[in-house]
Amino acid sequence: MMDTRTQSVIAISIISAILLFGTLYSVVYNTYLDTSNPLLTHLPHHLAKTHYFATKSNPINVYFIKKAWGWTSAAFLFSWFTSPPQIRSINRISKYLTLLMIWLLFTSWFFGPAIFERVIVASGGQCVISLPSGDPVVVPNDFCYRKITVIPETNPTLFTSTFTLPPGWGAVPRLRKGHDVSGHVFLLTLSALFLFDQLRPSFRVAQWSPLHQLAVIINIAIIGICLFSIGTTAVYFHSPLEKFTGFRKL
């Protein structure tokens, strides 16, 4: 059996190859959407009508990618609780909790705004609302940090009289224009490598219970979906640099 280092190199190489070839394809055939451009992000992907995975409403994006850490957590815990006693170690739980903290720091909170949000702002990003007309309106960054819905009635100073808005209209602002690190690539890579690492103890024991066998199958399936999702993200979303910085942050 290959040593742990070799297995890790192979896993990272597979993900790198998927990301590289997907990104090259997106550049050669102009299939990617620049998600940091406020003039484009509110529009459907230009290939949405002909490429199924170019639409953000596809089931894998809605039910898996956006909830990937939840799936990862469930798969790992199912595997850990059904593992043979000799491999059900506290060290494995510690690894999970460490990665959970990393995920939260990058995506949710880092002494205020998350690290991803800080990167966008530090690289020139602004908090932007997309009006129904497609025009972007810049608002204070705090609106994006708090993720609150902005409506003209409560924030009249943000909207000029030249904008005609439908009654009851409101929008949640997003950070745009800066370097929008691909959170999907970051999270999917984190999930795939973690689950791969956590499968290794299972393959070192000779016999599994039926429940643990099911857990292993589920973990392998989720790794497969993560790899596929990295591929679709590489082909259809984010600029090449944004995708590779999402990968390199690991």
Indicate residue ranges for each PLM-predicted region:
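Terminal transmembrane helix and immediately flanking juxtamembrane interfaces
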Residues: 1-250
